[in-house]
């Protein structure tokens, strides 16, 4: 049943709803973690339609809880007056041990928690892949792009030759 519902998301079968492609360029991701999200019913239905944007969002630890801030899940058309607020703070569900590890990384090492992917797992539950990352400087971004381009050219040459 879950795979049938996942096929409704923009014709995708992997359950992916939204991806933060800019985060791989802007940040150097060291560690990833899967977190659950507390959603209301209209948000889940909107996600099943693929109407979400996590490009400008981030996660932060506040008062011993992990929150997703500035993520946009558009309103669901069939929910009329019982709809949700599109850019509200959403609580992320992680274990106590994972939360303490994340908060230590942010406080001590000055890292950032960035959302990478929003998707439905095999059981049909909405999950968010978050990464612990450090910001890249402009020269790091150029160097990363140059390495990627060289790898692409090298693969093209090896394939042709």
From Swiss-Prot:
Renumbered residue ranges of the record's region Disordered: 1-23
An annotated GO BP: trans-translation
Cited Pfam families: SmpB
GO (cellular component) term, any one: cytosol
Coiled-coil region list: none
UniProt keyword annotations, A-Z: Cytoplasm, RNA-binding
Gene Ontology terms for molecular function: RNA binding
PROSITE patterns noted in UniProt: SSRP
Matching InterPro entries: SmpB, SsrA-bd_prot, SsrA-bd_prot_CS
Protein location: Cytoplasm
Function (record text): Required for rescue of stalled ribosomes mediated by trans-translation. Binds to transfer-messenger RNA (tmRNA), required for stable association of tmRNA with ribosomes. tmRNA and SmpB together mimic tRNA shape, replacing the anticodon stem-loop with SmpB. tmRNA is encoded by the ssrA gene; the 2 termini fold to resemble tRNA(Ala) and it encodes a 'tag peptide', a short internal open reading frame. During trans-translation Ala-aminoacylated tmRNA acts like a tRNA, entering the A-site of stalled ribosomes, displacing the stalled mRNA.
NCBIfam families (alphabetical): PRK05422.1, smpB
PANTHER family to which the protein is assigned, alphabetical: SSRA-BINDING PROTEIN, TMRNA-BINDING COMPONENT OF TRANS-TRANSLATION TAGGING COMPLEX
Family in the record: Belongs to the SmpB family.
Name of the featured protein: SsrA-binding protein
Lineage, top ranks: Bacteria, Pseudomonadati, Pseudomonadota, Alphaproteobacteria, Hyphomonadales
């Amino acid at each position: 049943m879950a795979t049938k519902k996942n096929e409704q998301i923009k014709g995708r079968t992997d359950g992916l709803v939204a991806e933060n492609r800019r985060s791989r360029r802007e940040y150097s991701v060291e560690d990833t973690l899967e977190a659950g999200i507390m959603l209301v019913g209209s948000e889940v239905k909107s996600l099943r339609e693929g109407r979400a944007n996590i490009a400008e969002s981030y996660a932060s630890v506040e008062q011993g809880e992990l929150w997703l801030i500035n993520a946009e899940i558009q309103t669901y058309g069939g929910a009329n007056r019982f709809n949700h607020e599109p850019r509200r703070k959403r609580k992320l569900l992680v274990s106590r041990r994972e939360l303490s590890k994340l908060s230590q990384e942010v406080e001590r090492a000055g890292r950032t928690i960035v959302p990478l992917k929003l998707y439905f797992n095999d059981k049909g539950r909405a999950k968010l892949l978050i990464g612990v990352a450090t910001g890249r400087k402009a020269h790091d971004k150029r160097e990363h792009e140059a390495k990627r381009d060289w790898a692409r050219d090298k693969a093209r040459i090896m394939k042709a030759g």
